């Protein structure tokens, strides 16, 4: 999921449980509409790979993700920017408040995604 803030999801996709996050995240970045130039992209540590960071730069974003501690050439991250990532985590927490999402009652992907869309609309209206 790519979210603008604690209430606004821009895009999301459903992937198998064994699939890696980074390839799906790169695909979501490619699907984003045109956003203001040089806006910050707060990413989870799973997306700190070179390919994902380079794609973010190519699309005009400033990737904000801490480097892996064992990286040979780490980069600097402004901790104040990365702390804002908790806004996105709060969106995930509120979505998990919908029992149907966290327990995965739906057997079909289309039904799960439909309810996720409904839950996102409800959260945006709060």
Regions found by a protein language model. Give the residues of each.
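Short acidic-glycine loop/turn motifs at beta-strand connectors
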Residues: 2-6
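Active-site beta-loop-alpha junctions of metal-dependent nucleic acid enzymes
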Residues: 12-35
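Helix-centered, glycine/charged polyanion-binding patches within enzymatic domains
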Residues: 18, 37-105
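Charged phosphate-binding loop/patch that engages nucleotide di/tri-phosphates or the phosphate backbone
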Residues: 112-126
């Amino acid at each position: 999921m790519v979210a603008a803030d604690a209430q606004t999801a821009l895009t999301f996709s459903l992937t198998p449980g064994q699939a890696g996050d980074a390839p799906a995240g790169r695909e979501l970045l490619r699907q984003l509409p045109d956003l203001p130039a040089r806006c910050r992209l707060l990413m989870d540590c799973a997306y700190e790979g070179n390919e994902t960071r380079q794609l973010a730069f190519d699309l005009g974003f400033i990737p904000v993700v801490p480097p892996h501690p064992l990286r040979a050439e780490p980069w600097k991250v402004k901790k104040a920017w990365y702390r804002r990532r908790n806004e996105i985590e709060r969106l995930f927490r509120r979505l998990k408040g919908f029992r149907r999402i966290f327990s995965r009652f739906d057997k079909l992907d289309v039904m799960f995604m439909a309810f996720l869309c409904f839950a996102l609309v409800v959260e945006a209206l709060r």
